[in-house]
Amino acid sequence: MSAFIYNNSNNNNSMRLCVMGDGGVGKTSITIQFISNHFVNCYDPTIEDLYRKQCLIDDQVYMLDILDTAGQDELNAIRNHWIKSCEGFILVYSVTSRSSFDQIQSFLDQIKFLKSEKVPIIMIANKSDLDDERQVTYQEGENFANRFGMSFMEVSAKYKLNIDEVFNQIAQHCVKRRCDHIYINKSIRNKNSIFKKFNQKLNNTFHSICKMI
């Protein structure tokens, strides 16, 4: 069950994030550790869960709506519906599973296919505390993330290593993207206004010349 009841809201201070990755990489453990500050080791396979938490980002309070997605292929349709509505994405693999790392590319492709523009994405490697079972090096993860312009961290849901940092960073990226959009839209409106005034002045000048002739 979800940790918080979800209420649909158009509040500008509400932000939708999506946690994606193969089954068994610890998406739910990561999310619950962030939401409730405790580690869940045994958990039923997730279908779709939505969690909520208030966070202070750049001196402003935001309500984070965090979708913990299913890893199963048969639930792609549900996942696709939610991807379209999310602002930022956390892609998760396990350092103990080479196959989960290889699957990150497919999740990236899915986001690019469903989103019409570039969105903030951070890639994280969970279970960094299980170094003896490691199949993916830190350098491999960092190189892959750099190739696709993503931030990268290794985390441990069990020991809450870098968990808060991950969610704070993706939320900050989303806030910056919102601000950039506002600035761009304002610049476009200003340019359109200047262009309109210039055309009006040009037309007035033209009419004045015509009257003189």
Swiss-Prot record:
It is a lipid-anchor. Belongs to the small GTPase superfamily. Ras family. It is an enzyme of class 3 (hydrolase). Keywords: Cell membrane, GTP-binding, Hydrolase, Lipoprotein, Membrane, Methylation, Nucleotide-binding, Prenylation. A motif (Effector region) lies at residues 43-51. The modification Cysteine methyl ester is found at C210. GO terms for molecular function: G protein activity; GDP binding; GTP binding; GTPase activity. The keyword Nucleotide-binding applies. GO terms for biological process: signal transduction. Ras proteins bind GDP/GTP and possess intrinsic GTPase activity. It is found in: Cell membrane. A lipid is attached at C210 (S-geranylgeranyl cysteine). The gene is rasU. GTP binds at residues 21-28, 68-72, 126-129. GO terms for cellular component: plasma membrane. PROSITE patterns: RAS (PS51421). The keyword Lipoprotein applies. This is Ras-like protein rasU. InterPro entries: P-loop_NTPase, Small_GTP-bd, Small_GTPase, Small_GTPase_Ras-type. Residues 211-213 form a propeptide. Gene3D superfamilies: P-loop containing nucleotide triphosphate hydrolases (3.40.50.300). It comes from Dictyostelium discoideum (Social amoeba). Its EC number is 3.6.5.2. It catalyses: GTP + H2O = GDP + phosphate + H(+).
